[in-house]
Amino acid sequence: MTLLIAILCAVIAVAVYKSSGFKRWRYSKDLTFPEAPKRDLLYGYYSCHDEQVSETKDHVNLFFESQFQGQDRAIQNILEMSRTTILDLSAQMFTREGHTGPFTLRDDALLHVIAFLRRLSDAGALKHVKYLYPIDEPNNTVQDETTLRRAIALVFEAASQFIELRGVRLAVIYAADKPNICQDAYALVGFNDYDMRSHVLVSDKYKQLKASLGVGQQIMLIPGGAYGQDPTPFINFANANAEVGAVVPFLWFDDHTGSVGSLGIRSNGMKDAYIAAGKSVCAIS
């Protein structure tokens, strides 16, 4: 009798496992690549540090510059990469008290943004900037929504003074556990939820984001490569779903501050998979 019960339990378990409802939430590579992949999909890593430009230039068509090594290096990186660029301007725009307080808008933010954009323009780098990024995870970092609205208006005011930025748009990555404040202002919208792995693609948060998109808005997917997540489901999903405009893996370089909690893609055994993913996108675009 015990053996019979065990067999019945095993049969039921297999049936549940194979059911579409369960399989939908199982981390796997079963998201198939579409027959007609996109030709305009963007692929590039969140932020940049160390020798990332030379290490990734052969398999990205998107560059994300966060100025982690200062303005001079940022300009050099953008010129060397010569790809569609997302430029983080938080260094010019925001300040905070201590290491835990909210970010507030600097009184002289406009002057600093214009001065930096002028340096980029004079160096011939500004023409590569297609998206401006006021600050990372604004729903988790900025003082309040009013502050973010002011920052967004300031970015557009500064950009209006440069012919290279005619038609420039905004990009954002939100924290997953809080409302997407000011989402309507951004053309490229993403959120990070690394614990969900590829299940994030069928999560309620993703469905809500997709349903809330306005005209001209697209989603960027953020696979957690630094945490061992396979890029394949994200690339396949991006190619199969019209609302996805970019895949922005986190994180190529090795963060030694301790905030990431793991090595980057370049060193954690995931490098080959992400290089192949990038080349699959760039070969088509």
Write out the residue ranges for each language-model feature:
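Feature marks short, highly hydrophobic, charge-poor N-terminal signal-anchor/signal peptide-like helices
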Residues: 1-5
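Glycan-processing catalytic domains of CAZymes
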Residues: 25-285
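Membrane-interface motif at the C-terminal end of an N-terminal transmembrane signal
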Residues: 12-28
